[in-house]
């Protein structure tokens, strides 16, 4: 069936949407569910759920505490294994909520200064950067083997908010475990300008990071 990938994607999107909306309602919290490889879908009264494009993207879905989908955010900068995906365009990456203005950049997007500067100039106060790094946390960092991967990651996150007009808080949840034959490691963190406020104790395994502001 040549259309099987799209049929599966539509079903997976529906399940993902329903489960994450339910989780947001259950916890009464804003929830960023990232990420999902799928065409972006819309809903309209007569047509139901549909997509305007057949192209797959790397998408993060952002929900409010009532389980309402606020934004469907596409990744803009793609890694070599993602080159079969369609690059997203800037747009839904800034969301104004009752808790403040939230910027969303998926993994690699958050390392590009032009995306950070744009969100900061638009007034984003909180940056959400869901990440998946398929590399050992303690390996030598390829551009500078004298430093370790994790060391560079944390230092970069601490520096990312320095000197900004509005950005004050960075939440960087990191995928751990085996997915599609790849091993992912990373210490999730909550950062302020120049410092890590909370860091997961290890680059593998599950851990909840809580911060009272």
Q: At which residue positions do the language-model features occur?
A:
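CN hydrolase (nitrilase-like) catalytic-core segments centered on the catalytic cysteine
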Residues: 12-32, 110-208
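Short beta-strand scaffold segments in enzyme catalytic cores
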Residues: 34, 58-62, 93-94, 187-191, ...
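Active-site-proximal beta-strand elements of phosphoester/diester hydrolases
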Residues: 72-75, 100-109, 128
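A short, polar/charged loop-to-alpha-helix boundary motif
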Residues: 75-89, 206-213
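Glycine-/acidic-rich phosphate or pyrophosphate-binding loops and their flanking alpha/beta elements
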Residues: 86-99
